């Protein structure tokens, strides 16, 4: 260790060495020896106890080719059976055909067994257990939803729910919903059952009007209740516009009527015999949980199939 005392000792040794050489008559040789000793002492000090400024420069300067470099840990590519979302997810807008809709497409390989890590948009439960809240809709939440005064339900008749759900990553996450006040408690019961059954949900978030009307990328997968929009392909209000219907994992549970498939890239999930996580299936937990509160399922429709859709009226 190079201390101030050590430096003084080194200087004393240098003076002593120089003096001894002068007494020997070799003044020049003594000076050279002193210089060598001084350089050695200073080199030892700088390498053993660099100043904070020098240390900072050493850390921030480019490393030598053989030195290890520090780097941040990347986001996990896999958690349990779930993987990170493809970088292109939600970015590739589909072309719209003459009928004003995008054509159904083959499911990309990355989404044929879709199990994506959930990105927390609300704080997850600290204890990993089920929790839920029901309250009047805060003004800021209403403002970022699709609700307007033209919707068929008053804002005072809606409730804001936070609900814990199980992700495809096996973790507990917190989602949010807008729902009609008269079904809010029933929905808490349903999602509590799904959580207890480890039924996975990818995302549960309130959509804005802009999000609902955005050009389709065909790969969305948001579970939600309220959406102020008409019935698909019709002018009348959807049950979602009243807060009386749930779309559950739309990608794993697509809508199909003739050639129309929504989401458009979810065609792999039209094969209901190929059971995969997150799918609503007859006589299984998701369908049973909604049936227990008296709700119907779009998978039972005859003229079309709407596997994601559960509603209080059955329509």
Segment roles from a protein language model:
Residues 86-111, 230-315:
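Catalytic cores and adjacent binding grooves of peptidoglycan-active enzymes
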Residues 113-118, 132-169:
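Basic/polar, acidic-poor N-terminal "presequence/leader" segments
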């Amino acid at each position: 260790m190079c201390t101030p005392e050590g430096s003084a000792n080194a200087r004393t040794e240098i003076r002593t060495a120089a003096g001894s050489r002068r007494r020997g008559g070799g003044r020049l040789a003594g000076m050279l020896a002193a210089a060598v000793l001084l350089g050695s002492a200073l080199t030892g000090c700088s390498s053993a106890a660099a100043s904070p400024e020098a240390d900072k420069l050493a850390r921030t300067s480019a490393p030598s080719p053989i030195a290890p470099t520090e780097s941040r840990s990347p986001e996990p590519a896999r958690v349990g059976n779930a993987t990170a979302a493809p970088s292109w997810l939600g970015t590739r807008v589909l072309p719209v055909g003459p009928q004003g809709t995008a054509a159904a497409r083959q499911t990309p390989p990355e989404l044929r067994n879709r199990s994506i890590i959930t990105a927390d948009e609300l704080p997850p439960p600290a204890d990993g257990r089920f929790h839920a809240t029901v309250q009047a809709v805060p003004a800021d939440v209403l403002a970022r939803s699709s609700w307007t005064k033209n919707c068929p339900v008053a804002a005072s008749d809606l409730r804001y729910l936070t609900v814990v759900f199980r992700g495809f990553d096996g973790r507990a996450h917190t989602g949010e919903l807008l729902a009609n006040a008269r079904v809010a408690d029933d929905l808490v019961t349903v999602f509590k059952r799904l959580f207890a059954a480890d039924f996975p949900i990818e995302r549960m978030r309130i959509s804005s009007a802009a999000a609902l009307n955005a050009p389709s990328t065909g790969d969305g997968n948001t579970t939600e209740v309220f959406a102020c929009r008409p019935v698909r392909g019709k002018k009348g209000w959807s049950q979602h516009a009243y807060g009386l219907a749930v779309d559950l994992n739309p990608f794993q549970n697509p809508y199909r009527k003739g050639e129309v498939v929504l989401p458009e890239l979810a065609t792999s999930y039209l094969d209901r015999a190929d059971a995969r996580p997150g799918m609503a299936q007859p006589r299984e937990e998701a369908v049973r949980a909604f049936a227990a509160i008296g709700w119907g399922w779009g998978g039972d429709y005859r003229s079309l199939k709407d596997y994601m859709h559960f509603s209080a009226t059955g329509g």
